[in-house]
Amino acid sequence: MANVDVLDLGGKKVGSLELADELFAPSEVNEALLWEAVKHYRASLRQGTHATKNKKLVSGSGKKLWKQKGTGRARVGSVRSPLWRHGGTVHGPQPRSYDYAFPKKKLMGALRSALAAKLADGKLIVVESFEVSEPKTKLYRTALDKLEANRSTLLVESSQSLTENLYLGARNLANVELVLNNEVHPYDLLRYERAIFSRAAIEKLQESLQKTVSRRRKAEVA
């Protein structure tokens, strides 16, 4: 079991937390799986509203310009022909969804890899609680500075512990995103430089991820 320090919002150690080796060991990092998860996530974000005008949609008359035979010229149907300038586009992009099915086991494996990578890089921080006295952005900005999270930061709180003070105080922080423990995605962990979990959030996330690890893998790590 790996131990991680639990801090308060002032940056002082107030305890420690044991993390499961089958989730947070450096050997659990699978870069290929992380790439697949990020590719799927970014594909699902695409609007897919691109469209080109084909022969049916482009403006222009559909009348045949000249008779089929006898003129010596090449046969032609209308000015909307794809062969002509300002004609329709052939096989151009049309509106579609770029989303595709991604196995849940792969997603959970990628999440374990992202967490292990963050811990190995020393960029994963656990705090006892995000609670402050009032919903002030300044209070959270000061807390992040003391936690040495001056750049982009991902805040992860459990759904049961989310408070109005945290929601209102963190929403106006630049380069900071707040998510719940059941919403965190590998892409979020890779996108932000530091990830700060509350104790409740990391415990619940660890509990749910342990259910996705095979017994064989648990035995190998043990």
Swiss-Prot record:
Biological processes, Gene Ontology terms: translation
Which Gene3D superfamilies does the protein's record reference? 3.40.1370.10
- Highest taxon in the source lineage: Bacteria
Q: Which GO terms describe its molecular function?
A: rRNA binding; structural constituent of ribosome
One GO cellular component term of this record is: ribonucleoprotein complex
Q: Does the keyword Ribonucleoprotein apply?
A: yes
Q: Name one Pfam family in it.
A: Ribosomal_L4
Keyword check for Ribosomal protein? yes
Annotated TM spans = none
What does the UniProt keyword field contain? Ribonucleoprotein, Ribosomal protein, RNA-binding, rRNA-binding
Identify the InterPro entries for this entry: Ribosomal_uL4, Ribosomal_uL4-like, Ribosomal_uL4_dom_sf
Function (record text): One of the primary rRNA binding proteins, this protein initially binds near the 5'-end of the 23S rRNA. It is important during the early stages of 50S assembly. It makes multiple contacts with different domains of the 23S rRNA in the assembled 50S subunit and ribosome. Forms part of the polypeptide exit tunnel.
Concerning its family, UniProt says: Belongs to the universal ribosomal protein uL4 family.
How would you summarize the oligomeric state and partners of this protein?
Answer: Part of the 50S ribosomal subunit.
Q: What is this protein called?
A: Large ribosomal subunit protein uL4
- Gene source species: Acidobacterium capsulatum (strain ATCC 51196 / DSM 11244 / BCRC 80197 / JCM 7670 / NBRC 15755 / NCIMB 13165 / 161)
